[in-house]
Regions:
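Sec-dependent bacterial lipoprotein signal peptides
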Residues: 1-20
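Membrane-proximal, proline-rich intrinsically disordered regions
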Residues: 22-79, 321-322, 330-335, 343, ...
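Short, surface-exposed recognition loops and adjoining beta-strand edges that mediate ligand/DNA contacts
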Residues: 37-41, 65-87, 168-183, 224-307, ...
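Hydrophobic-face positions in mid-chain alpha helices that act as interaction patches
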Residues: 49, 71, 233, 257-397, ...
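Conserved, well-structured interaction surfaces
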Residues: 91-168, 202, 219-227, 385-392, ...
């Protein structure tokens, strides 16, 4: 993991959307125009720069050749290890299997990449939070832009620790969390040197105490401020979405319901309907997006981006090796007219292949196409087949409805859960009728649609 000056040297006037995209040191600038560690921590400009750097990491962090950049690529790779993905053909990503990932070592495997990514976020949030609390003056801390950035920093730290605990520790269990080994705990109380020294492994309970404290601080801070309408910033509704995920993981059903409802009510987003969901997931102004990122027009996105790696229509990308299909055990339960069927190509369903699909998918092998014919993923598309241009997704409104529905069902609120599930699925399948299932059967139905809706968005692996 590289130090602050390698990741977050902020040139004067640099904004979030003017940062290069395909290099790990994407915020490094010349020494004559950059801010050092102390300057970054001790000034308003530095705090804003650190938080902008965190956002840049979310879409531009370089995981290495062929992996794809940023959190969306890591989310997709995690879902490759879930039970909803099928592979029967040679594919460049075949090494990312559940058992294989447990045995891999080195700095070019998913274990290291996930650890490094989330802890790099944490290290820099610690520096930002420490500077806000201990270095800025009271008047500086009252500045609305500074308060907003501080709120985002707290939310980022909670998000990153929650991801780490799910990946590298036991799932939260209220009866054992106080003794279950969690992850290494680093906070803003450490000095810069201490942030990179060996530290003890905390418990799962300690991790979630910090996560929930950070989320509370972030929500209290952001709720009282004018919301940044850009979806490449964390807003009050986005933090409520993170809190809903955390509560669901902890089996705190009442809190999960509350936070999901709060996210929905304040998101300034709405569910996409029918063909709107076939937009290729490449435009962060899409109605349903809550959190995503847009590259600047001047940025050379090249071959390292998420869409260059995983879209189905970018010429000369890596995607013709992305031969992974949806599990037909769940896909075949979709309604005949469910628009989500078009996110997957099933050779036996007599579907039309999209006209602009990359030629690498098309060579025939024994009379069949060269992709994963059981249900090839075609969910992601670039805006123009000759360019890797396109926005990247972190959180959608639909997820909040599924969290709310599950939380309601877990509390025995079957009628409410049925209505919530109907509300979201009806936008995907015009023929969908109000569910009548109750109890475990209703929960299974909620999971079915959540699994299909959010596959490759980094949700299913954690739900397993």
């Amino acid at each position: 993991m590289k130090r602050l000056h390698k990741y977050l040297a902020i040139a004067a006037g640099v904004t979030l959307l003017t940062l290069p995209a395909c290099k790990k040191d994407f915020l490094e600038t010349s020494s004559t125009t950059s801010l050092g560690d102390k300057q970054a921590e001790g000034t308003q400009e530095g705090l804003l720069g650190i938080v902008n750097g965190l956002h840049s990491m979310m879409y531009a962090y370089n995981f290495g050749q062929g992996f794809g950049a940023g959190a969306p690529s890591l989310n997709l790779r995690l879902d490759l290890m879930s039970d909803d993905v099928i592979n029967t053909q040679p594919a460049s990503l075949r090494e990312y299997t559940y058992l294989g990932a447990h045995n891999e070592r080195g700095d070019d495997v998913i274990n290291f990449r996930a650890w490094d990514f989330y802890y790099t976020l944490i290290q820099h949030t610690n520096i930002a939070i420490r500077g806000f609390k201990n270095t800025l003056t009271e008047d500086q801390r009252k500045d609305k832009k500074i308060r907003y950035s501080a709120g985002e920093a707290y939310a980022f730290r909670a998000y990153a620790y929650h991801q780490l605990v799910q990946l590298f520790a036991k799932r939260y269990n209220a009866s054992t969390a106080a003794s279950d080994p969690g992850v290494v705990m680093r906070t803003d109380e450490a000095t810069n040197a201490q942030l990179y020294e060996k530290a003890r492994r905390g418990t799962v309970a300690e991790a979630y105490e910090l996560i929930e404290s950070d989320l509370k601080m972030a929500m209290e801070t952001l709720k009282d401020l004018d919301q940044n309408n850009s979806r490449n910033h964390l807003r009050y509704s986005t933090v409520c979405g993170i809190a809903a995920r955390v509560a669901l993981c902890k089996s705190d059903w009442a809190a999960a319901e509350t936070y999901a409802k709060e996210a929905i009510a304040n998101a300034n987003s709405k569910l996409q309907v029918g063909e709107e969901l076939l937009d290729g997931f490449n435009d962060y102004t899409a109605n349903e997006w809550m959190w995503g990122y847009r590259y600047a027009e001047t940025q050379n996105q090249g071959y390292g981006t998420f869409l260059a790696t995983y879209s189905t229509n970018f010429d000369n990308g890596w995607q013709d090796h992305f031969r992974f299909a949806v599990n037909r055990n769940i896909f075949d339960q979709l309604g005949t007219n469910d628009v989500r069927r078009k996110w997957w190509y099933c050779y036996d369903q007599d579907q039309n292949i999209p006209e602009d699909v990359d030629a690498g998918y098309l060579p025939l092998i024994s009379g069949t196409p060269g992709f994963e014919i059981t249900g090839q993923c075609m969910k992601y598309r670039v805006q123009n087949h000759a360019s890797s241009k396109g926005d990247v997704l972190i959180m959608r409104l639909g997820e909040m409805y599924y969290i709310q529905a599950e939380a309601e069902a877990r509390q025995g609120k079957d009628a409410a859960a049925q209505t919530t599930l109907y509300t979201v699925v009806k936008t995907r399948d015009a023929d969908f009728v109000q569910p009548t299932e109750t109890g475990d059967a209703l929960i299974e139905k909620i999971f079915l649609h959540k699994r299909l809706d959010l596959l490759f968005e980094g949700v299913r692996f954690f739900d397993m």
